[in-house]
């Protein structure tokens, strides 16, 4: 599923850009959509990318709280910006997107960490998302 892989990568890039610029991710998403419509060299933003970014935006506080709670030895502010946004995207998809198998979410997040972050990041991302996966039933119950 190369299309889903690309959609995740683009969603991560949108979250990363919003974090770096201090701008809401929905504003960045709108910019990307507008830019793709006005510049034929830019690929369109896929439905799945939009679903991931929009879904994340509805859960941003909860996701940041979970990452802060389970990231042993790291505060959200001290965490590398790349890792923080890979974790944000992975946590959203893991906990709230039922159609994607958990193993796929973890693998894709680790691949993003390998591509965009430090040598230590893949194991950090895998460990934290693995912990959230184990807690997923109780995390979703806490939402109700």
Residue ranges and their predicted role:
Residues 1-144:
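N-terminal interaction/assembly modules
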């Amino acid at each position: 599923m190369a299309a889903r892989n690309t959609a995740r990568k683009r969603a991560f890039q949108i979250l990363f850009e919003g974090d770096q610029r201090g701008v809401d991710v929905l504003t960045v998403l709108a910019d990307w959509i507008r830019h793709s419509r006005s510049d034929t060299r830019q690929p369109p933003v896929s439905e799945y990318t939009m679903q991931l970014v929009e879904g994340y935006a509805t859960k941003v506080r909860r996701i940041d709280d979970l990452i802060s709670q389970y990231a042993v030895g790291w505060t959200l502010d001290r965490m590398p910006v790349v890792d923080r946004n890979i974790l944000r995207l992975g946590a959203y998809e893991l906990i709230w997107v039922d159609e994607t198998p958990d193993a796929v979410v973890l693998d894709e997040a680790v691949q993003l960490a390998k591509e965009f972050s430090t040598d230590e990041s893949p194991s950090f991302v895998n460990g934290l998302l693995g912990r959230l996966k184990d807690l997923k039933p109780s995390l979703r119950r806490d939402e109700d």
